[in-house]
């Protein structure tokens, strides 16, 4: 078993840290998003689960639906669903992408 205390990990802004990655299964990543910064409108090939560990974020989906939340918020995006994430305060996030890599992802090619 591998384990991490997500509340105490030293994660630098703009340097996502891959915690665990198993081909064909999932990839777990932590992010530090400073207050006022954002992950601009994007999509990923995998189903994306975003969990707020600390701070507060605002999530916008397809330029329409907006959800705001702090620690404990779980947002799940379908593969290729466009979204953006803004930090309302310094935020620490856990991102789980599954399956890893998803269909169409450049890393899925053998």
PLM regions and their residue ranges:
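A cytosolic small-molecule/anion-sensing beta-strand core signal
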Residues: 53-54, 70-71, 89
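A short, N-terminal "cap"/entry segment at the start of jelly-roll beta-barrel domains
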Residues: 1-27, 70-71, 75, 107-110
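Glycine- and acidic-residue-biased ligand/ion/polar-headgroup-sensing regions
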Residues: 46-62
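Ligand-binding loop in jelly-roll beta-barrel domains
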Residues: 79-103
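Short beta-strand His + acidic residue motifs that chelate non-heme Fe in jelly-roll/DSBH
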Residues: 39-41, 59-60, 77, 82-88
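Short acidic-glycine-tyrosine-enriched beta hairpin
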Residues: 63-80
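A generic "binding-loop/recognition-motif" signal
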Residues: 35, 45-46, 65, 81, ...
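Conserved short histidine dyad/triad with adjacent acidic residue
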Residues: 13, 27-44
């Amino acid at each position: 078993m591998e384990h991490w205390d997500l509340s105490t990990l030293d994660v630098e802004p703009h340097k996502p840290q891959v915690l665990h990655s198993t081909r064909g299964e999932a990839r777990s990543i932590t992010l530090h998003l400073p207050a006022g910064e954002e992950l601009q409108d994007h999509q990923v090939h995998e189903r994306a689960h975003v969990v707020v560990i600390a701070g507060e974020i605002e999530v916008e989906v397809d330029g329409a639906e907006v959800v705001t939340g702090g620690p404990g918020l779980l947002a799940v995006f379908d593969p290729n669903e466009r979204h953006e994430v803004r930090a309302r305060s310094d935020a620490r996030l856990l991102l789980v992408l599954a399956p890893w890599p998803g269909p169409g992802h450049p890393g899925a090619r053998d």
